[in-house]
């Protein structure tokens, strides 16, 4: 198994700073990530066909399966397998900001690639393998 990580962020509220609606302004801050920054997929179905890496797509797919098909983590970007600023789509389309496209966003993710999945038994444990192939439009 390959390890992935989501970069830790901080949110700041600066006293006296308000938006046009009178709400406190919030600032999302994170450390600089050294290396070649890549966007692997988006919340609207984009997949980088130049790299079409397996791990980011598998991570998104894993979040869908692990949540019982209730949500999916997309908009995977970062350096290598250190991801930053993900977006979450939920079945009901509620929470997680304006980028939550709900079931439509989930469908866009699955439309962007095809995958082959099979189980393999090893030492009495079943391992699920997913192989992704980006669709070239």
Regions found by a protein language model. Give the residues of each.
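Conserved structural core of kinase catalytic domains
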Residues: 1-53, 83-137
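Short linear interaction motifs
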Residues: 51-67
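Catalytic-loop of the protein kinase fold
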Residues: 63-85
């Amino acid at each position: 198994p390959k390890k992935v990580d989501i970069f830790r962020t901080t949110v700041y509220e600066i006293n006296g700073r308000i938006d046009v609606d009178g709400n406190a302004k919030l600032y999302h801050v994170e450390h600089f990530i050294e290396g070649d920054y890549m966007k692997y997929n988006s919340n609207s179905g984009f997949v980088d066909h130049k790299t079409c890496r397996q791990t980011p797509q598998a991570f998104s797919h894993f979040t869908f399966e692990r949540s019982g098909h209730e949500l999916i983590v997309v908009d995977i970007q970062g350096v290598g397998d250190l991801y930053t600023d993900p977006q979450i789509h939920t079945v009901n389309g509620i929470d997680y900001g304006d980028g939550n496209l709900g079931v439509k966003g989930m469908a866009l993710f699955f439309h962007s690639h095809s995958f082959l999945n099979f189980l393999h038994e090893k030492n009495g444990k079943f391992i699920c393998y997913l192989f992704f192939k980006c669709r070239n439009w």
